[in-house]
Amino acid sequence: IRRVASAPNANSLNAHRPPNYPAQSQSQSQSQHQNPPHYSSLLQMKLNSSTSEAFSSVPAFPGQLQRVRSFRRTYSSNSIKVRQVEVGPSSFVKIRMLGKGDVGKVYMVKQKDTDKLFAMKVLSKREMIKRNKIKRALAEQEILATSNHPFIVTLFHSFQSQDYLYFVMEYCMGGEFFRALQLRPGKCLDEEGAKFYAAEVTAALEYLHLQGHIYRDLKPENILLHQSGHIMLTDFDLSKGSSPPGKPGVVKASSPNQPPSINTKSCVNNLRTNSFVGTEEYIAPEVIKGCGHTSAVDWWTLGILIFEMLYGTTPFKGANRNETFSRIMFWEVKFPDQPAPYQNRTLSSSGKSLIRKLLHKDENSRLGSCAGAADVKSHPFFKNVNFALLRHQSPPILPLIHKSNGIDAVNFRRMPPESMSLDLESDDVMVSIHNDHKNNPFEKFSSMTLYHEGD
């Protein structure tokens, strides 16, 4: 069962009475396309924007089933070029539905003039207005339009019609990380596999914080797999941004042989929000208490994610929401035996230490609360991890691709037939809406085409 983010009434938890929870509906949103960028040093990206780094392609893997090569992409100060939108709904042909949520759906589409496959996220304006989710769509576009990172899904086009908002994104043919875990023995990874993906997620969170954003909804359902097996974060509608972000600080290295690190905490220092958002099993204690939260919630969710990757379940899951919240508030994390086939292995002391420090109940004492990602990356658990070269290493999960472009979507669950199919051919782009901004709550949603170096 895929877990959905919600905003329940948490005050009743502290008042010791049954909470009045809103009804839940199943929600899933997936975003995708073919060619991701390669990983380069975040320190050089931020502190020396004139420096370009390019890495060679990930080699093809042997075997009967074909795995697709990635192309070379260069990072530089002009690696994203924004132009007036050059496409519309009728520029694409729907292939199949990949996922759906309460306000929209995600389709695999093919661009007519290039035959390239993309993931098209289509959001209903009517449903967003009805559910008060307009700001979420605007926040997601802001993050996607300004992000350029190998572990964050790439946006190529965004536009709107009279009734819908459109995001045309990277099609990650490896599918949903949640599904990949569910299909593994024990629904989990060994320690080295969990460490690898934890490192990639940490790098992505570091970049988001550097840009002034708090993710706030990290979970396996919001992570996609590129065809090479590397992760791609998606679904940023619950993210919160600081505009402009604070300036990054510098953390001196503990050894003269090591380079300094970036203090990303200073980029989001002024960002504190009281919104009750997140996914039940991943919500941090300070969110439940309703006392406001900061970027520390992202490090809490990282701790929950690492635990789930290792044990196939979350550490504080209860029989119901109220019990789960109570355990989050008052229970200390316990480490059971790993499921088969890893039951004879014991989690290392550094692994337990990392999870305990990430799941500290006090956000001010939690790992990452001082210097952000620099604190997490310097933990002994990641001692042998070269974060700058993650994109060159072989991931623990290698998705099998039957067809080179992934058009058969073998790594996605089969969706039921649509009751009302969206007709892309008859939906026209709204070219100009500025004259009607008083009556159009989506006036700030930008129609744009983004070009990336190497495309």
What does each model-identified segment do?
Residues 1-89:
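Intrinsically disordered, low-complexity regulatory segments that flank or precede the catalytic domain
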Residues 157-158:
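A short, aromatic-enriched beta-strand patch in the conserved N-lobe beta-sheet
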Residues 272-275, 279, 284, 288, ...:
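Eukaryotic Ser/Thr kinase distal regulatory-tail detector
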Residues 153, 162-170, 178-179:
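A conserved loop-to-beta-strand element in the N-lobe of protein kinase catalytic cores
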